[in-house]
Amino acid sequence: MTKYNITEKKEKEAHYRTLVNPKLMDEMKERILDIIVMQKKYKDKDYSARKLAEDLGTNTRYISAVVNVRFHMNYTSFVNKFRIEEAMTILVDRRYQDLRIEEVSDMVGFANRQSFYASFYKLMNMTPRDYRLQFLNLHPGEKVKRTKKKKSEKDKSEE
């Protein structure tokens, strides 16, 4: 007699996902992209699926269904993807080279450093710091030269 009854987990689609009209789902997908990406709501730490649903006049279950079916990920992963993409740009931008990783995390909408690092690593298979260092090693001419600000003639005359 076996002690454990182990069965293989069956992959099944949530029933509510199949009830949504595909045409309506495509329309909602475009509206979600407009709000999250074009309006850059992904930068808002407090912009949840609930707030998105309110803005679209629907419920969170419907938002979840559309994001899962059309983007093949959950809402949090969907939003974090755009945050990470922007962070990648900032991390290698000479203008932001002096920013700490935590500051970049805050700029793109993560609530804390830990979730930023975890999301970044999950998507890129490296830490944000390693990503920045790798870029700088591959493009050494891209480093910002730290020089003292020169005094203008006006500043010199005021001394």
Regions found by a protein language model. Name each.
Residues 61, 113-114:
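Key DNA-contact positions within bacterial/archaeal DNA-binding proteins
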Residues 58, 110-111:
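The short coil/loop that forms the "turn" connecting the two helices of the helix-turn-helix
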